[in-house]
């Protein structure tokens, strides 16, 4: 099925068009000696007209019958193309961007394509418990590969060293997998899920 691109989508977000909307589905999590648990997750990738995607994920543990048991965790962040920032871009702080986007056409965006044929991206994700991750990677067609470039932990936060995340669109389902290195262990499987889009991308500003 062709990927639908919202008519009001800023050119810089076209590589992310296949992610936009709300997704829901089930998966499994575990790590080290922790018991493997089934979960349900709702993930939203939202565009507002600015050159970044707002990411939110809500995870609920399931019981042995597959029914919701209790909330597990939330995370949220921002996905964007990794490129040098210019005077017309947002920030620093609350300083707004220029009304006209820095990248105004598909041709401008195409110039950012890397040697592998994809686009370099940065993804910042904040987790409860005082952990913030900065991922670098690429988006190439309906696939995203990410690896942590930096992890910030608040004093008293649990030990978390690094992570990798993989996202892909397979038969119109969003598949993702997360490996992490934590608690002094090497990078290993942590969680994965298969999600179905339940709401299409909303128009910017809605």
Model-predicted regions and their roles:
Residues 2-7, 13-201, 205-206:
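Soluble ligand-binding/transfer domains with enclosed cavities or grooves
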């Amino acid at each position: 099925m062709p990927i639908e691109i919202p008519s009001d989508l800023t050119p810089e977000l076209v590589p992310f068009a296949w992610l936009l909307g709300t997704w829901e589905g089930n998966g499994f999590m575990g790590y080290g000696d922790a018991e493997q648990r089934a979960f349900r997750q709702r993930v939203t990738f939202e565009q507002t007209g600015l050159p970044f995607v707002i990411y939110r994920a809500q995870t609920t543990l399931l019981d042995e019958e597959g029914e919701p048991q209790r909330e597990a965790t939330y995370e949220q962040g921002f996905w964007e193309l990794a490129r040098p920032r210019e005077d017309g871009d947002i920030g620093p702080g609350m300083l707004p961007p220029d009304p006209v986007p820095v990248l105004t056409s598909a041709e401008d965006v195409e110039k950012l394509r890397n040697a592998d044929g994809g686009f370099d991206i940065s993804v910042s994700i904040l987790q409860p418990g005082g952990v913030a991750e900065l991922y670098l990677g690429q988006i190439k067609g309906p696939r995203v590969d990410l690896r942590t470039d930096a992890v910030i932990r608040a004093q008293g936060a649990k030990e978390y060293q690094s992570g990798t995340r993989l996202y892909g669109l397979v038969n119109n389902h969003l598949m993702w997998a997360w490996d992490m290195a934590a608690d002094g262990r090497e990078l290993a499987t942590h969680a994965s899920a298969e999600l179905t889009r339940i709401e299409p991308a909303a128009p910017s500003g809605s």
